Each structure stands twice: as C-alpha cells, then as structure tokens.
Amino acid sequence: MDEDGLELQPQEPNSFFDTTGADATHMDGDQIVVEVQETVFVSDVVDSDITVHNFVPDDPDSVVIQDVIEDVVIEDVQCPDIMEEADVSETVIIPEQVLDSDVTEEVSLAHCTVPDDVLASDITSASMSMPEHVLTSESIHVSDIGHVEHVVHDSVVEAEIVTDPLTADVVSEEVLVADCASEAVIDANGIPVDQQEDDKGNCEDYLMISLDDAGKIEHDGSSGMTMDAESEIDPCKVDGTCPEVIKVYIFKADPGEDDLGGTVDIVESEPENDHGVELLDQNNSIRVPREKMVYMTVNDSQQEDEDLNVAEIADEVYMEVIVGEEDAAAAAAAAAAHEQQMDDNEIKTFMPIAWAAAYGNNSDGIENRNGTASALLHIDESAGLGRLAKQKPKKRRRPDSRQYQTAIIIGPDGHPLTVYPCMICGKKFKSRGFLKRHMKNHPEHLTKKKYRCTDCDYTTNKKISLHNHLESHKLTSKAEKAIECDECGKHFSHAGALFTHKMVHKEKGANKMHKCKFCEYETAEQGLLNRHLLAVHSKNFPHICVECGKGFRHPSELKKHMRIHTGEKPYQCQYCEYRSADSSNLKTHVKTKHSKEMPFKCDICLLTFSDTKEVQQHALIHQESKTHQCLHCDHKSSNSSDLKRHIISVHTKDYPHKCDMCDKGFHRPSELKKHVAAHKGKKMHQCRHCDFKIADPFVLSRHILSVHTKDLPFRCKRCRKGFRQQNELKKHMKTHSGRKVYQCEYCEYSTTDASGFKRHVISIHTKDYPHRCEYCKKGFRRPSEKNQHIMRHHKEVGLP
C-alpha cells in the first residue's frame, strides 16, 4: 500500500479526492480536490471512459478509506493525470436550492475509471445529457476566459446545450453537482427531498450508531463492504498510533426516554473484554477496550406482530469495532475465520448499519430516513464483531387471544398514535410486544390465581383443577385431620401443610393494614393514619391523642385513653394485686375471679362481698348519693328526672297523654310528641261505622270486617261463616264449588279478586272518598275522577 496517497481526517465531515501522485498533505500544484459531504466512494481515474467496478483498484496508488463519524466517510483518491488549463472546457453549476452547495472550480475529467458505488460524470460530446433525477436549465453564461458555465436550476428536468466542440457532463441519478469557491463537490442524495420527508413521517424506526474513531472498510469484489474487527494491516501506523477496540452496545431503549440515539462512554475499568483482545499502547502497556452504549427505538407498533422477516433483537447486544490496525498474527487468524464464514454463507446481505440490527435480513426497500448515506456494515459473529443475537427462524405461533386495551394519544409529530397502556402502572407502549415484555415486571399480578381452596392454601387458575383438588379432600377422612392451626382453627393432615398455612398468617401480619374507625380509609403506616385522623376527623372529635391520633368527643374519654400510653392503672382489686386503667375492667375481673369467694352481692351495682358487713357499708354509698325519695315507695334517685321516670313507669297505670288522631296514651309528653310526629305527612282514614282512624287503608278494611260484622243470621254449613242476607250466602256457596268469591258485607258487590275486593271496601265504605257516584255509590277523591267514572261505566244512564 502506498502511504504517500493516504490522508485520514477523522473529525472532518467531508471527503477529498486528490488527483495528484504527491503527498496528500500538500494541496497545491496540478490537482483537483473533490469534496464529498456524505457517503460517496470514488476510486482511481484511469482513461477516457468512466467505468464502474466493485472497489477493486487496478492501480495500487488508489486507496479508499472510510471514517464512520456520524454517518460521514472520508476518502482520499489519487488520480494519475490532469489535463492542461487550456483543455478545461466547462463547469456544471447547481444552486443551493438542490443540495445547499455550489461548484465554481472548472473541472475536466478526461481519463478516469470510477467504481459502481461512485456517482461521477463523463465528458463525451457537445451535448449535455442529464438523468431524470437531475434538474437542469437552458441558461448559459460565458465567462471571460471563454469557458461555458451550465447553470442548473430546480425548474427544468432536462436540457441540451450546444456550444463549441466542448465536452458534456453526464451526471448520475444519484448525484447532483454544484459550484463552490475552490473545489468541486459531489454530493450523494439517495432519496429525493419530498420522498425523504414522506418516508421519515411514515416510519420512525431507527438505530443510531456513533463512533468517535475511524473504522476500516474491507473491499470485496462481488459484494459490498464489511467492517471487520481483524485486518491484514501492520499492527501500528507510521505515526506510532496503535490499534484500539471500541465495543458498541446496542440496547432496546424505552420509547419514552429523552436521550434516544445517544452514546454513553463507560469507564475503562468497568467493561470486560469477552473476546480476549489485549491491545498495547505506545508504552507497551495493556489497554482496556473503550465501550460505548448505543440506544435503539422501534416505534412501529404493527411491525412486531405482522412482519415475520423482522429479526428479534436481544436485550443486550454488542459488537466490537477495531479502530486502527491489529497484530499481524491475530489478523491472519481472523482473516482465515472470516473467509470460512464467507464460504459457509454464500450470500451475504449488506445494508446500512442504521438498519442492520433492526431489520435482520429484510433489506429490500430500506433507505436512510435522515437523508445521509450510511456506511455498509456487515456484522459477522465469527469475525469477532460481538455477541449479536442469532437470527433463528421462529415458528409461527397462534395469535394471542387476549384482548389488550388500547388508547390514542397525540404523538410528537402532532398525529394520533395508538398505544398499549399497562393497566397496573399506567405506562404506555407502542406495541403489544413491548407491553408483554413490560408485564414481566409485575410478577405478582401475572401469578395471581383465580380459585383458592377453602380447606388449604391451594390456588389455581383452572376451575377443573380446583374441582379435582376438592375431591382429594373428600377422600381424606376427618380423623386424619388431627393437626389444628392455633390462629384460625383449620385442620390439616400433615405438619407440612400446617407450616405452609402458618406462613400465610405471618405474611398477613407483616402487611397489617391500619383502618380508620370513622371511615373506610386504611393504610399500612400508623403515621399516615394519624395524619388522616387529624385532617379529616378532627372537627367531629376535637380531643385528639398526640400519641396515636385517635379522636374523642369529651376530655374524660381522652383522659381515660391516655392511660394506655402512660401505663397508669388507678383501679386496684381489693382482693388481689390486679390493677386496671378502666373501672369496667376491674368489675369484670371481680366477677370472673372472685365471685365464688364472695357470695354477698349488692342489689344496686351487683358488686360481691365476702360478708354482710361489707355489703351494708357499701350500701351507704348508694344512699348518700341518692337524695330524691319516691313518695309511693322506698325508691331513691340521684336526681329529679330519674325520680319522675320511676313514678310514671311504676306508679301510673293510666296514660294521661292521649293522641288526638288515634287515642293512644303515653306516660310523658315527650313520648306523645314523638308519636304525633309519626302521624305527620300521613292521611288518616276514618271508619264510617265508628270513630276509628288509621293511616293504613288495609288496616281500616280489616277493622271493618272484624268489628262491624257481628249480626250474621245466615251461616254457611261448611265453614260456619255468617252473612246478613241470604243472597250473600248464595254467593258464598259458590266458593265451595270451585273458585273463591269475595262478597262485600255492606253491599251486593262480590268478586273473585282479593285485591279488587279490598279496593272496593276502601273506596266505597270509607269517608275518605267524598265524591260518590249517584248510580253505584262508588267514592272518589276528586270530582273529575267521578265524572270519568260515570262517562265510562254509566254513559247510557247519564245521558238525557
């Protein structure tokens, strides 16, 4: 390899093609420098024809070097000859509206050979031939030195310019040539601008890879190029720079992340070199490979489920890219392995790195979305490029029968986007696959069983499994279930089942919930419950305990409660050393522990004593406190209200306070007042035969039937029921023959409907229906109801 024609500019976003054989660092003399802004590969210029071959240089002076820096390639190409200034004939100019660059240097390419992947021009005749993707115009400008400049605009698709015997530039479909101040720029544009924007909007799947150092391109005569980790170059360059390994990690990032597409440097002490590549720097010390993280996002929600050619990407995939050169021995071994890999795989698919990991072998129709040409990169596992997940053919699985809930949100571009929300934590995902993968973070919900056995801790999702399990319990006799749980009383046949059951009680105790006694609020922390009580229930319970937050209505209740926290026990048993904070607990203690020893009991408070003297002394306490003596008996009360209640309830047999509506009597006016309030809003029904009133009409009908039917001379021989008239008895006898007939006791009305009969008695034989029909005596509440009745049932009689 000729080092004189080698120029590597690792941080410049352009490419230069040198046509001289001199050192590339001197850009003067007879030379033409072609600046390529994006990915364009130009090889040696040989003869009058422009031919394309697969990056195999016929001239050893031609070298192609690619530097992958934000998808920009730098190349320096030597050309053998250049024409004299007098032979330079014309310049093709494309304004900035096409590719934002100009060409002003007059260039004449006479004898050059350009490979297939290079977009170049050929000077052939006096006519200008432009392909359909190049926009040209007929505008002609003649310079001072006699050269003709062809100005190309956006508006004209194709034009022919006839001048002196000049040459013409044939521009490829993939290249637009522009005019600039010092150098001819060949700019590659794989997609038209309009189509580029459309494609960018249709699909946003991308994988961004950024390297800080130059890579190496291997030339293959039949295929594209591969970026390989091993090389046949000497281990160190002339300037003393030694090779370096960059390990690039590819992660599937969350689409909600803000830093998608970036790279993150990892400290050199953290990563592990899985492939055992040890590199020496200039001081012969081992250098740990640097690592970079590259994030990927897949935004097409339909891609994962529908596209079967899409390769599944592992969660953590990385590839090693060697920058510089490697040891010759290691490079030779790697080259042999690479050739073996190429023999095994007869057809290699090369595609831009931006799509290689994300689309697997689906390379048809894939173009760069952001308008830049990416380096063709083949990721080869055997060549040491990393642990990329193997593309194994997947079996076609049955579609998931579960229904996933979807939601529609507004995406970053302002268009509606269908997402799959997680029903547990609320996160949203752009495909069902991402949601399924995310659901693994909620194992407690995935493993939750629907059916639980009531006799043991067995759980299952299948009803038939639970049924079979319950059948096994039936086979086990009750005698075998001798082990009982101390906490809940369940029985188990063996100690192992009991131990598993007790673990449930421990888990419940660890997750104990503190519930508010005044509402349904509950929490696992006592402090949160205290704050809830202070914030919500402090108005109803103004006296709050400062220790636990419990509220009370009266200070005495709070004082009694505070004894729990202070440990104060003022009440002591007189028969033993038992002490209590509450007097009621002391009474309970005495009744349960000392009742047999003390047979004498107080009639008032039911306290027991060991002898009669203690009972008499205790009775004096009750007599001193009760100063209100009843005049009718020996009863004493502590206050006058208790004495009044005693007199009314014991010594008053009559009820002086009577209700005006129903004549019910009460001892006290307060009781009568409550009773009268019950009558409000209710209409009273008056019996027509007596002064009986009742709010319930059905009760009134029962009153009439039971009270006002005593004179019944005609009785039935079968049921001994009496009737006032003989025709009523005849109607009654029909009931014994079959269907029951209800006969009104006040009129000749009879019916077989019990509810109709009750309505008849209420509406006809009560005073609550003042408006009565003149023909049938049926009563109505309003005159309009009576008129409607007459028009419906007595129409012929009512008409004059």
From Swiss-Prot:
One Pfam family, short name: zf-H2C2_5
InterPro entries: C2H2-ZF_domain, Transcrp_activ_Zfx/Zfy-dom, Znf_C2H2_sf, Znf_C2H2_type
Protein's cellular compartments: Nucleus
Alphabetically ordered keywords of this record: Activator, DNA-binding, Metal-binding, Nucleus, Phosphoprotein, Repeat, Transcription, Transcription regulation, Zinc, Zinc-finger
GO BP annotations, alphabetical order: regulation of DNA-templated transcription
GO molecular function terms noted in the UniProt entry: DNA-binding transcription activator activity, RNA polymerase II-specific; DNA-binding transcription factor activity, RNA polymerase II-specific; RNA polymerase II cis-regulatory region sequence-specific DNA binding; zinc ion binding
Modified residues (Phosphoserine): S269
Domain of life where this protein originates: Eukaryota
GO cellular component: nucleus
Disulfide bonds: none
Zinc finger (C2H2-type): 420-442, 451-473, 483-505, 514-537, 543-565, 571-594, 600-622, 628-651, 657-679, 685-708, 714-736, 742-765, 771-794
Family: Belongs to the krueppel C2H2-type zinc-finger protein family. ZFX/ZFY subfamily.
Biological role: Probable transcriptional activator.
Name used for this protein in its record: Zinc finger X-chromosomal protein
Name of the coding gene: ZFX
